Amino acid sequence: MAAALVSVPRIKLGSQGLEVSAQGLGCMGMSAFYGPPKPESEMIKLIHHAVDAGVTFLDTSDVYGPHTNEVLLGKALQGGVREKVELATKFGVSFADGKREIHGDPAYVRTACEGSFKRLGVDCIDLYYQHRIDKRVPIEVTIGELKKLVEEGKIKYIGLSEASASTIRRAHAVHPITAVQLEWSLWSRDAEEDIIPTCRELGIGIVAYSPLGRGFFSSGAKLVDSLSEQDFRKHMPRFQPENLDKNAQIFERVRRDGSTERMHAITARVGLGSPPRKRRLPHTWHNKNRQLQPERGGTVCEAYTG
């Protein structure tokens, strides 16, 4: 018998009025970075099942694919689904000849927004993040253009991803920032020094990705053996032989003292039933989805209401 669906809590993200599901569905791994793209029809069914289960905060970016993840999500949003969700996407990163480029100039911001509209099939984005900060362009200039998009009704709320505390303050002075997205886990805790206290002070919500260390804290070193050549984690320094042994020792230590169970308790409060084709979704929606496997995880929100 399929497990009964459990109500997903809803929270205020930040202090500007945005309400989202406490668990979010990061869609990146459906199309990019975590191995080959997954079958489109299965991913659309998965998204629909998540929404039906109450996970309505959907996260993507124009760089995932690039572009293909937004196209996928756009198809999933058809048929009245758009009205049921809080849609977040990002701009500011592109790849040219294999080289990453960061953009924050006003013309790029506006062009990127229009491009996301077309791929997603929408005329308004609920939460629009600057994916990475362009150090060549003052943050005040970038946020100024985003503020215009808010005033024009094209986006509702502004977010930043991977921004410093000082950048967050400067941005917030131009227009209220609703959310900051960052990596936050047992081995990524630098944000606790300045960024998270700054967000608390300013009433900015935190959207944490990879709370289980990109799957390491749920699987340990054996995770690396299962990664395909197309999985970007295979090339991350933390998973290389010179670091893996030490990280494996840390994993065993936290596993013995129960920290991994506590991490599961933090990120997995929602039991989900059976999706299409009777494939069961795990209880956990950990870091940024990765096909919703417990070692690969969803977006977790922490709300600060100021």
Curated annotation (Swiss-Prot):
Family the UniProt entry places it in: Belongs to the aldo/keto reductase family. Aldo/keto reductase 2 subfamily.
Name of this chain's protein: IN2-2 protein
Active site per the UniProt annotation: 64
Disulfide bonds: none
Annotated organism of origin: Zea mays
Compositional bias annotation for Basic residues: 276-289
GO molecular function: aldo-keto reductase (NADPH) activity
Family annotation (Gene3D superfamilies): NADP-dependent oxidoreductase domain
GO cellular component: cytoplasm
Keywords, in A-Z order: NADP, Oxidoreductase
Tissue: Leaves and roots.
Domain of life: Eukaryota
Conditions for induction: By N-(aminocarbonyl)-2-chlorobenzenesulfonamide (2-CBSU).
